[in-house]
Structure formats: C-alpha cells, structure tokens
C-alpha cells in the first residue's frame, strides 16, 4: 500500500490519519533529533495499534503536554507509560499509549 503523504500537513492532521489506520510519510523539521533524523528528512510512520510493540529508542509521533513531537521513547513504565524526549537529552514528558499515534518504520 502506498503511504498517505502527510508532508506539509499539521501534526494533528497526521495524528488523525494515523488513528484512522493510514500509513504515512511525515517530514520532520528542526535539530532536536540530529543526527538520527536531519531537518527536512522524511520518514514512514505506521499507526500504533493494540498489537504494536513499542520499545526504548523507537521514534514515534506523539502528543506531549499539548504539543506534537516526532521524538524518541526514552523509558517505559509499567508497560503503559512512555517517557518521550529528543536526541539531545531533553525530555518532553510521560505519555500514555493513546497519545502515541505513529511509529517510524523507515527513514527516507
């Protein structure tokens, strides 16, 4: 299946499309994930479903404290809470699984 092109979309729209079950291409901007992801680099995200395995160091599209991030899972607590942060040592905060919309499965 060809991925839905989320590029240029607001992250809340991308999150909605992922919740609808669409695989999507997302472009991230900024320096917070370098060198793992460069500013302007696109990734393929798959929707996070009940059976999706989430692990430390996975890159996910999530919502933390009202903001959307394409950041790393730093830690997992009780198999249901996830500490999200960037690649430069800055944590964003803890989220529940339902605040994680997509998991990066390929860097383009």
Can you name each region flagged by the protein language model?
Residues 1-108:
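Extended hydrophobic leader/signal-anchor segments used for secretion and membrane insertion
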């Amino acid at each position: 299946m060809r991925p839905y092109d989320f590029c240029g979309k607001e992250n809340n729209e991308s999150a909605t499309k992922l919740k609808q079950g669409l695989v999507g291409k997302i472009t991230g901007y900024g320096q917070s994930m370098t060198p793992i992801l460069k500013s302007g680099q696109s990734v393929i995200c798959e929707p996070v479903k009940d059976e999706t395995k989430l692990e430390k160091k996975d890159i996910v599209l999530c919502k933390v404290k009202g903001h959307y991030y394409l950041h790393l899972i730093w830690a997992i607590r009780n198999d249901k809470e996830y500490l999200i942060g960037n690649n430069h040592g800055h944590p964003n905060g803890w989220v529940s699984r339902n605040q994680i919309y997509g998991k990066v499965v390929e860097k383009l």
